[in-house]
């Protein structure tokens, strides 16, 4: 999942952010609100272009990237953007792999347990296809939530691409009349405005006509579940962003002794108040992009506190992209990546990478989850 220039590390210089900035549309019918939603929706193209750039240059292996990039929009990104896309993607891949029990040293019991992922603002993200291609060894249900317009584009791509259809399989796949929702045994695409979920009260499982009803119909609340938000919640107001997380932690997955593990991974920009951060925010504003929770969760410490406040008491950690490059990427792999392109802007790379972070936390469940204990987080605002 990705983000505009910004969340994808994509663009202080080229504009265009990408984003797991997605899934958030709104009940507000004003033209101003509609325009803001369209700006956020448009960041998905930037994300897919950045992903394809990194794939074609050899940073990442992703056979599905081209199928989910709009025709004619291919573009080679700057080296620092390609490296940022690489670090963000591989770091989140490591967290996902650990949660799913895909590592060689994963607990055998946990590894065999069926699990669920819910991706907020997924847009054109390819992770679902990369994971579903591991079946039947991997038993998983994958949900994506986004604006209807982004879903429609993705579903059309699936319908027109045999490669994606083969991964999904042909059995029991249904598409809504509007073409903005898809449902199958292992993969669901939901057209839901996240702000409507934020408006539901704690423990409120009423159905009515709201989109949350459809979500509740398909989400299996008995499974260990991982929530992904790659530059998605940051586009909501602080109250709505917190409300969305509460919807999952209190309404769909209320904590109890019988509750299964619930985890959350966030990818967001940070540190808006130094010189680089102020320039970043100003550049995004010229494109109509407003990061509404940026100042509330401006540091690694604030992101960790956010996770604690939402009940992720099993553990919380966070690290900026610079730290992840230095500590999570093996030296041999660093050499391989460095050989792909000449990266002259080392100082700029470090500045950019220090202004984006990955944060992760989990809530203990009836099945023990320890898969993130070996992943280093940053202990201080270095």
Curated annotation (Swiss-Prot):
Keywords: Methyltransferase, S-adenosyl-L-methionine, Transferase
Gene3D superfamilies listed in its UniProt record: Vaccinia Virus protein VP39
InterPro entries the UniProt entry points to: LCMT1 (IPR016651), Ppm1/Ppm2/Tcmp (IPR007213), SAM-dependent_MTases_sf (IPR029063)
Family annotation (Pfam families): LCM (PF04072)
GO biological process annotation, one example: methylation
Catalytic activity: [phosphatase 2A protein]-C-terminal L-leucine + S-adenosyl-L-methionine = [phosphatase 2A protein]-C-terminal L-leucine methyl ester + S-adenosyl-L-homocysteine
Start-end of Polar residues biased regions: 1-11
GO molecular function per UniProt: protein C-terminal leucine carboxyl O-methyltransferase activity
Domain of life: Eukaryota
Enzyme kind, highest EC tier: transferase
EC number: 2.1.1.233
Residue ranges of the region described as Disordered: 1-45
Keyword S-adenosyl-L-methionine recorded: yes
Residues bound to S-adenosyl-L-methionine: 88, 121, 146, 193-194, 230
Family listed: Belongs to the methyltransferase superfamily. LCMT family.
Protein function: Methylates the carboxyl group of the C-terminal leucine residue of protein phosphatase 2A catalytic subunits to form alpha-leucine ester residues.
Protein name, per record: Leucine carboxyl methyltransferase 1
Lineage of origin: Eukaryota, Fungi, Dikarya, Ascomycota, Pezizomycotina
């Amino acid at each position: 999942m990705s983000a505009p220039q910004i969340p994808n590390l994509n663009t202080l210089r080229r504009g265009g952010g990408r984003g797991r900035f997605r899934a958030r549309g709104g009940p507000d019918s004003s033209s101003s609100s509609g325009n803001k939603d369209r700006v956020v929706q448009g960041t998905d193209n930037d994300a897919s272009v950045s992903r394809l750039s990194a794939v074609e240059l050899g940073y990442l292996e992703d056979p599905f990237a081209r199928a989910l990039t709009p025709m004619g929009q291919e573009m080679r990104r700057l080296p620092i953007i390609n490296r940022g896309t690489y670090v963000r993607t591989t770091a989140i891949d490591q967290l996902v792999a650990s949660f799913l029990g895909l590592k060689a040293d994963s607990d055998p019991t946990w590894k065999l347990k069926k699990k669920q992922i819910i991706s907020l603002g997924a847009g054109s993200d390819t992770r679902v296809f990369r994971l579903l291609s591991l079946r039947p060894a991997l038993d998983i249900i994958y949900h994506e939530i986004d604006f209807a317009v982004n879903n429609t584009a993705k579903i059309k791509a699936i319908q027109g691409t045999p490669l994606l259809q083969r991964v999904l399989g042909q059995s029991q796949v249904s598409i809504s009349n509007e073409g903005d929702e898809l449902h199958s045994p292992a993969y669901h695409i939901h057209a839901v405005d996240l702000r409507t979920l934020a408006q539901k009260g704690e423990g409120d499982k009423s159905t009515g006509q709201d989109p949350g009803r459809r979500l509740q119909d398909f989400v299996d609340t008995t499974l260990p579940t991982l929530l992904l938000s790659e530059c998605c919640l940051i586009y909501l107001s602080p109250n709505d962003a917190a409300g969305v997380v509460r919807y999952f932690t209190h309404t769909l997955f209320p904590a109890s002794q019988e509750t299964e593990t619930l985890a959350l991974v966030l990818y967001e920009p940070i540190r808006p108040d130094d010189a680089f951060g102020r320039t970043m925010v100003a550049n995004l504003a010229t494109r109509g992009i407003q990061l509404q929770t940026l100042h509330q969760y401006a540091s690694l410490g604030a992101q960790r506190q956010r996770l604690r406040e939402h009940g992720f008491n099993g553990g919380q950690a966070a690290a900026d992209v610079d730290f992840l490059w230095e500590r999570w990427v093996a030296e041999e792999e660093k050499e391989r990546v460095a050989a792909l392109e000449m990266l002259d802007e080392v100082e700029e790379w470090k500045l950019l990478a220090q202004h984006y972070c990955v944060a992760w936390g989990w809530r203990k469940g009836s099945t023990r989850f320890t898969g993130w204990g070996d992943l280093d987080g940053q202990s201080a605002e270095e």
